[in-house]
């Protein structure tokens, strides 16, 4: 699946000095991206390319290459691809995204799952996230800033200025739409309908290199996530204080589908949590992260030898569930270990 691919790729390759493997996989992904952008039939079986956040995760993936290899190499290999993705999005050509005048991206998710919280029952999403979705617009702002800077470095000043202006508009709208009076971010907003449940999707606005939030706002979001979502095995998909909390991924398929994103803990989200933690606490946060990561050592010999389960129950004893090895979890743990080894914030 496309989302899993782009989130996992940096950790599974760049973080362990396998740059050539990153480039090989991205070459295949590049073909799939262009097939989608050009509305051409594709022989490449990368599923769900049409989902609204996929191209934005592809930009994030390329951004990690720029950080972990070099910006110059990134411009040379992926500069044109990056600009083509951004033009496609800015020209409002994506079939499942609408670029509104306020600079935010809107998507319809009432009747179909459109994000990583994609559990469905009888063809309907368990969590019908629709409208302005917080992580999609966080990815969007980050992509605008990163692509704008890289385009400027490549001498494409017109595109750089256009993306920068759109980022300014998007950033202001993001704060107005998502930040609530309690200091955390709404999960999604559709007109007068606001989703107040505390979910982990807000953590990306603290973790990413470019965020519309200021330092105080970032710390407020991180504090809420720490208090309500952090477990020894990852971030809960829903706060115990929110309605519908169901931390146990057990029972028949339909029962597990309802619980999938309603309180279970996901290790891959902890990778972004720790990236956010380092941005706020810098060197003083390293000890906490190192102690936390030690907790996965027992897990690697409990449910699957040498790997990490897909998800965990959200309450003690935080039992491993789902697939016995999950690429996004492994990737983000490797990426955080890399960040700790190269720490230079």
Language model features by range: what are they?
Residues 306-309, 341-345:
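C-terminal non-catalytic interaction modules
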Residues 90, 97-100, 141-249, 291, ...:
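Catalytic cores of carbohydrate-active enzymes
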Residues 1-5, 9-114, 118, 133-137, ...:
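Aromatic-rich carbohydrate-recognition surfaces in CAZymes
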């Amino acid at each position: 699946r496309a989302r899993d691919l782009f989130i996992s790729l940096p950790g599974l390759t760049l973080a362990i000095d396998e740059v050539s493997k990153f480039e090989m996989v991205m070459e295949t992904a590049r073909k799939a991206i262009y097939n989608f952008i050009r509305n051409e039939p594709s022989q490449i079986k990368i599923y769900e390319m049409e989902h609204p956040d996929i191209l934005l995760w592809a930009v994030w993936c390329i951004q990690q290459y720029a950080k972990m290899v070099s910006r110059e190499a990134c411009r040379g290999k992926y500069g044109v691809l990056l600009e083509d993705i951004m033009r496609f999005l800015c020209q409002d050509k994506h079939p499942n995204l609408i670029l509104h005048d306020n600079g935010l991206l809107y998507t319809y998710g009432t009747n179909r799952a459109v994000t990583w919280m994609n559990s469905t029952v009888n063809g309907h999403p368990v969590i019908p996230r629709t409208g302005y979705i917080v992580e999609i617009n966080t990815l969007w702002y980050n992509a605008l800033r990163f692509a704008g800077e890289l385009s400027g470095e490549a001498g494409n000043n017109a595109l750089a200025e256009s993306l920068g202006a759109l980022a300014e508009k998007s950033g202001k709208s993001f704060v107005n739409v998502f930040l609530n009076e309690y200091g955390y971010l709404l999960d999604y907003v559709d007109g007068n309908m606001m989703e107040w449940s505390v979910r982990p999707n807000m953590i990306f606005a603290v973790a990413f290199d470019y965020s519309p939030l200021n330092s105080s706002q970032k710390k407020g979001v991180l504090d809420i996530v720490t208090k309500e979502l952090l477990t020894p095995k990852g971030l809960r998909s829903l706060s115990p204080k929110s309605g519908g909390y169901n931390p146990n991924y057990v029972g028949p398929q339909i029962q597990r589908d309802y619980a999938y994103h309603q309180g279970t803990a996901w290790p891959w989200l902890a990778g972004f949590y720790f990236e956010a933690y380092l941005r706020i606490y810098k060197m003083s946060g390293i000890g906490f992260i190192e102690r936390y990561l030690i907790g996965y050592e027992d897990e690697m010999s409990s449910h699957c030898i040498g790997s990490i389960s897909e998800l965990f129950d959200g309450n003690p004893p935080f039992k491993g569930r789902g697939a016995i090895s999950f690429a996004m979890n492994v990737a983000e743990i490797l990426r955080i270990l890399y960040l700790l080894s190269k720490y230079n914030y």
